[in-house]
Amino acid sequence: MALLQISEPGLSAAPHQRRLAVGIDLGTTHSLVATVRSGQAETLMDSEERYLLPSVVRYHEKGPEIGWLARQQAAYDPANTISSVKRMMGRSLADIQQRYPNLPYQFQASENGLPLINTATGLVDPIQVSSDILKSLVQRAEETLDGKLDGVVITVPAYFDDAQRQGTKDAARLAGLHVLRLLNEPTAAAIAYGLDSGQEGVIAVYDLGGGTFDVSILRLSRGVFEVLATGGDTALGGDDFDLILADWIREQAGIGSRDDHSLQRQLLDMATQVKIALSDADIAEINIAGWQGKITRCEFEALITPLIKRTLLASRRALKDAEVSADEVLQVVMVGGSTRVPLVRHRVGEFFGREPLTSIDPDKVVAVGASIQADILVGNKPDSDMLLLDVIPLSLGLETMGGLVEKIIPRNTTIPVAKAQEFTTFKDGQSAMSIHVVQGERELVSDCRSLARFTLRGIPPLPAGGAHIRVTFQVDADGLLNVSALEKSTGVEAFIQVKPSYGLSDEEIARMIKDSMANAQEDINARQLAEQKVEAARVLESVTSALEKDADLLNEQEQAAIDAAVETLITSVQGNDPEIIENAIKQLDKQTQEFAARRMDSSIRRALAGHSVDEI
């Protein structure tokens, strides 16, 4: 089945009319655009027959320069030449400056704390920079295909959160594009290989690009791609190989520091050339700033080994999350230019126990997969049997009384997905309910990540437990979360789309998962205590209300017994023993059973007053 078989608004559904769609790999270091022509996916080249476009934009008086020309000027005009902007997408300025303290740009914060970069043409943000890169790719595509595009599929790292995905969508809209879908990069690579081979089983996608590392464990079964688990590092890639090599060259040559941005750019360019050379040769020459030297492949491999180990640790975590062993992995797909490094291929093959797949150019494979998906989504392949199922990396839920987390969608649930659950009011006459959306694996809200808050108002003032509120969590195909709350009797509804103000790194995700495992028993104990305290508060609220209304139904001895049980429960709640609280609740319940029966009788008598038996 095709993911989409309906016509887009304004588009003809005529079967003979082929629509123009492309897949775009919006990368940290380089970007590409690909399309399907005559049944074959191909990357589109520029006028000089280059398929890669450096993800670099230089802003100067005459307007933005994009790609190769901008990259050439980076060493001479670093403050106005923006590169690796993907790392800034969806992050706050404070987060960026903490993660990347040596960036040569003049930053200032927007009203909501997001980064603005001061350039020769004024202030720009990461969305604007990404939009300019997209415009260049679209211009290439439309000139090559001789027509306007009907839609695009843009790839993003699997670990991009809501804010980063939304920023990518905003950049595309700013470029005037109709986004058919955002697609995880590893999933796009699986399309590129999986459709051709038709093999079934578990595959691993190892994606080491310029600025991000992603690993995905997928299962191919009867044409369905299901992502079992994802992992990675949003701040690790070939750029880091270049950086560590540039530092080595600087140390060997005894020149400058990272604060010399012009020299730093020259060093990084030289490091890139050396890295590429060492993929084929055992030794590489270095000539920079009047210094000449050499580096062997063994020396280079010693420098990058710690970085490769980090990728393999993330791969091991992903396998554990997917509940599969390395032996069960039938294929390993290599993605990203950095996988050309011989040591990377060797260590990955050693880790998974099999030779990784490299038959499709690792620079092109993501764009190729995206173009195949775009061709399907735009309606050119209505008979395709391919279906994609991505997953969410962390559980989504909301806060309940006592600071507890009620998980609505557990982590690694395939998306798109929608799940609903009913909740009720805690107090008599409650007319509003605060909805606090959280993300994480722990049992208490204080240990999870807050995503958003909103309030449902207009709840009818009924007794506690009388109103019924249906809360729905819906995650779309792009991983964006929509939460709605509906009061069933009145139809009153509140809604929010979750857009975190800054990104969540994979290190934080891994830490949150690890913490949930390490604190599992402690969390269970804390939850049990919190649940008993919530129940105690409910019982005390109910008993207090009943005494205020009908204390005259009790004699002094009965009143004293109930008061004593109430005091015992209040005292127990101040402690931290759930069993003591539970026993105090039971004791109060026992003391109030006769009182409850009398209240029921009294209520019935009042209801029947003035009515004859015949009327009843």
Curated annotation (Swiss-Prot):
One of its GO terms (biological process) is iron-sulfur cluster assembly. Transmembrane segments: none annotated. GO terms for molecular function: ATP binding; ATP hydrolysis activity; ATP-dependent protein folding chaperone; unfolded protein binding. Disulfide bonds: none annotated. Keywords: ATP-binding, Chaperone, Nucleotide-binding. It comes from the Bacteria. InterPro entries: ATPase_NBD, Heat_shock_70_CS, HscA_NBD, HSP70_C_sf, HSP70_peptide-bd_sf, Hsp_70_fam, ISC_FeS_clus_asmbl_HscA. Pfam families: HSP70. SUPFAM superfamilies: Actin-like ATPase domain, Heat shock protein 70kD (HSP70), C-terminal subdomain, Heat shock protein 70kD (HSP70), peptide-binding domain. Chaperone involved in the maturation of iron-sulfur cluster-containing proteins. Has a low intrinsic ATPase activity which is markedly stimulated by HscB. Involved in the maturation of IscU. Belongs to the heat shock protein 70 family. This is Chaperone protein HscA.
